Regions:
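A short acidic, helix-capping loop that chelates divalent metal ions and anchors anionic groups
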Residues: 37-40, 72-77, 110-114, 174-176, ...
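Short beta-strand segments at enzyme active-site cores
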Residues: 32-33, 63-68, 99-106, 139-143, ...
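Active-site-proximal loop/turn and secondary-structure-junction residues that shape catalytic pockets
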Residues: 10-14, 35-37, 69-72, 106-110, ...
Length: 262
């Protein structure tokens, strides 16, 4: 039985309000927005924020999460104060718009023997966690090309309730990492999960970590959903279409797939 509502991550290069209407028509229960462009905390006025909240309520859509745009890893102190300040503004915006979850790609956890980068990364994420806690939100670190156990160990070491993990099967598969194993390894740290794989990815995918029986980039959906069930994840499954594809086709295809597991 599929216990997860489906969400849709919207494309920041397209008009947001049109996409919200489209998401509702498709049957999505929530959306993920990116804090960039017209939705940047520095550009979205108080009136704009009220109108956006009203539109989401009218369309009966939840704001699953707000995505924090990041251009580089947090393993360097270069312009760190400015980056943390911008993140803090996004945390405040997320809370005001009605979600307590912010997603961000912060880069790989540096190895412990790289002391300088590891210390910079640890201090930066700790600072972000403190800011998130102050704003009443959680910061979910998006999985990428590192094993789930490595991220879990790092999160365990910080032990901050304002930090979490977001499972991105497509990114993991492109890196040759099994999303099923990563989900189980991260366990209760998982606060958000995507529904998608890396088949047809423009960037290509590594050999499938589940063996020769699975094409490159393909996700073992039944095992993935089972792993999320095992760790007690009850949140949204967010569909994140590639900008080059029709989001309606992507969402509908996955919605039909999940019905077969119902």
């Amino acid at each position: 039985m599929i216990r997860h509502a489906l969400g849709l991550r919207l494309d920041s290069s397209r008009p947001v309000r049109d996409q919200i209407h489209e998401a509702a028509r498709l049957g999505a229960r929530g959306v993920v927005l990116e804090a960039i462009g017209d939705l940047s905390p520095l550009r979205l006025s108080e009136t704009g924020r009220r109108e956006l909240r009203h539109l989401l309520r009218t369309m009966e859509l939840s704001l699953v999460a707000l995505s924090l745009p990041t251009r580089r890893s947090f393993d360097t102190t270069d312009q760190l104060d400015d980056r943390i300040r911008r993140a803090d503004l996004a945390f405040a915006l997320a809370y005001e718009l009605g979600t307590n979850l912010v997603l961000a790609r912060v880069g790989q956890v540096p190895p412990e023997d790289d002391r300088e980068r590891r210390e910079a990364f640890t201090n930066a994420i700790s600072s972000l966690g403190q800011r998130a806690d102050h704003r009443g939100v959680r910061l979910a670190l998006e999985t990428g090309s590192e094993p789930g156990q490595r991220l879990k160990t790092f999160l365990d070491s910080l032990d901050m309730v304002s930090l979490a993990a977001s499972i991105d099967p497509a990114s993991l598969l492109r890196g040759g990492i099994d999303p099923v194993a990563a989900s189980r390894e991260l366990g209760t740290w998982v606060a958000h999960a995507y529904a998608g794989d890396a088949t047809g990815s423009a960037g290509g995918a590594a050999p499938n970590p589940r063996g020769l029986g699975f094409p490159a980039g393909a996700l073992d959906w039944e095992e993935y959903l089972g792993a999320l069930e095992e760790i007690g994840y009850r949140g949204f499954l967010t569909v994140w279409p590639d900008p080059s594809e029709d989001p309606r086709v992507r969402f509908t295809t996955l919605a039909l797939r999940f019905k077969r597991f119902g």
